[in-house]
From Swiss-Prot:
Residues that make up the propeptide removed upon maturation: 1-8
Matching Pfam families: Arch_flagellin
Similarity section: Belongs to the archaeal flagellin family.
Highest rank taxon of the organism: Archaea
GO-annotated molecular function: structural molecule activity
Disulfide bond residue pairs: none
Record localization: Archaeal flagellum
InterPro entries recorded: Flagellin/pilin_N_arc, Flagellin_arc
Keywords: Archaeal flagellum
UniProt record, GO biological process: archaeal or bacterial-type flagellum-dependent cell motility
One GO CC term, this protein: archaeal-type flagellum
Protein name: Flagellin B3
Alphabetical list of PANTHER family matching this protein: FLAGELLIN B1
Amino acid sequence: MRFLKKRGAVGIGTLIVFIAMVLVAAVAAAVLINTSGYLQQKSQSTGRQTTEEVASGIKVTSIVGYAPYDDSNKVYKPISKLAIYVSPNAGSAGIDMKKVRVILSDGSIEAVLKYDNSDADSDGTLDKDVFAVGMPDNVFEDDTGTTAYDGDQYITWSELNDKTFGIIVVQDSDGSLKPLTPTLNKGDIAIIAVRVGNYYVDSNGNLQAYSPTPDGVFGEGIKPNTHITGQVVPEHGAPGVIDFTTPSTYTQSVMELQ
């Protein structure tokens, strides 16, 4: 009988150990399930962010430059204006143009420009004429430094300087590109207007300097045989690339550079 009692005691002890092991396993399983759930959600979030970062971005489709013609001396001056055509990458989310930065360098100067959407008196209109909608006869039309459009929105090139760029809307089916809140969406095309020099030609064909004279990005402008590099950098996603060399001589005012 004593032997049987010992066997019963051993059986109860084994049962207690077994129950304890089951409880420990249950706790461990719960921890693993919670951890795996957290990691799954974290990986999904990271995946979405990575996909957005890779898919999002802005691309530079072309760059056109303008060199004013000095009729009195029969010579083209350095390039004074750049029209940088941009659109969003395929699959990109909306790009807030207020947060886009344009970086330009000629090897000696590096400038960083932003869109000036200031509205000091809060009347719902821009303080400067740096936004335009529609297709003009000439993007670089320049009687008084102004590109005119139908309506009351137009670009005044003289109000751009070495720290700001303007926006000319070429295509915007959903109306997302607005003066104070310009957002570049799928299918949109816009021109980033950059004044890189200080001269223009008036309606009489005479060479004029902007007055008062706010500096262009590269002073007098971009001279022949100059290598320009840079980027159009959105808040999120891949930047658009700027990389071109100007012709060795200028033989016309409007020229495609990239």
